[in-house]
C-alpha cells in the first residue's frame, strides 16, 4: 500500500532533509541520517516523478522495495519484524507490487510530522490491515484494506505520526486494539524518531 501523497507530499519531502532515525549505541542515542532518493538501500530502479497521462503526479517506484532496514516491534505480547519506510520514495511505494508478506512481518511508515493521514491500496496485491499510530507509539485506529482499491481510508485523528501495515487480520489474531502501545528493540518510537518543530 502507498500513502495518498496529496497533502502529505510537501511535508514528506522534509524527510529527505533531516536525520529522522536514531539508534542507540553505547547507551546513548546517535543520529542516523534518513535515506535520500540518492542514498536509499535499494538499487536505482525506474521511478515516476512526472505527471502521468491521467494527470496524476507519482513518486513511487515501479518495482517492490527491497533491502529496507528492519526493526523489531513489540505490541503487547506480540512481536513483529517491520521494514522501515522513511524516504519519500519509500513512503510513496510502501507495499506496492509485492505478492507475499511473512506472517509476523510488516512495514512501518515514519513521517517527520504529526497530521491526519489517508492510505489506499493502489498497486498493492496483499490484503493488509493498517494501524494509524500517534507520536508516542499508541495505536489510534485500525483498518482492513482491500487489495488494489484506490479508495482512501482517512484517519479520524489529526495526530498520526506512524502507520503500520501487516497481513490482514494479524492485529485481531494477536488481540491488538486501539490503545496498544508499540515499542521497539531499541526503545520507544518517539526516542528513535524524534519530532522536529517546524516554524
List PLM regions with ranges.
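Bacterial N-terminal signal peptides that target proteins for export
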Residues: 1-9
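Compact, glycine-rich, soluble single-domain proteins
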Residues: 22-199
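C-terminal motif of bacterial Sec signal peptides marking the signal peptidase cleavage site
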Residues: 17-20
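Hydrophobic helical h-region of N-terminal Sec-dependent signal peptides
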Residues: 10-14
Amino acid at each position: 500500500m502507498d500513502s495518498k501523497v496529496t497533502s502529505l507530499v510537501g511535508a514528506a519531502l522534509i524527510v529527505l532533509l533531516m536525520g529522522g532515525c536514531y539508534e542507540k549505541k553505547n547507551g546513548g542515542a546517535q543520529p542516523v541520517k534518513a535515506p535520500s532518493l540518492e542514498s536509499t538501500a535499494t538499487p536505482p530502479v525506474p521511478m515516476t516523478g512526472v505527471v502521468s497521462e491521467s494527470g496524476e503526479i507519482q513518486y513511487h517506484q515501479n518495482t517492490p522495495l527491497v533491502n529496507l532496514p528492519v526493526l523489531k516491534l513489540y505490541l503487547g505480547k506480540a512481536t513483529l519484524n517491520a521494514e522501515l519506510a522513511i524516504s519519500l520514495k519509500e513512503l510513496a511505494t510502501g507495499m506496492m507490487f509485492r505478492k507475499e508478506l511473512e506472517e509476523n512481518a510488516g512495514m512501518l511508515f515514519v513521517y517527520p510530522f504529526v497530521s491526519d493521514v489517508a492510505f489506499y491500496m493502489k498497486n498493492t496485491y496483499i490484503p493488509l490491515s493498517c494501524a494509524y499510530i500517534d507520536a508516542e507509539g499508541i495505536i489510534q485506529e485500525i483498518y482492513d484494506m482491500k487489495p488494489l482499491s484506490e479508495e482512501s481510508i482517512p484517519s479520524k485523528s489529526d495526530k498520526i505520526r506512524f502507520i503500520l501495515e501487516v497481513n490482514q487480520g494479524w492485529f485481531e489474531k494477536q488481540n491488538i486494539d486501539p490503545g496498544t502501545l508499540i515499542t521497539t528493540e531499541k526503545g520507544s518510537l518517539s526516542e528513535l524518531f524524534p519530532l522536529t518543530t517546524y516554524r
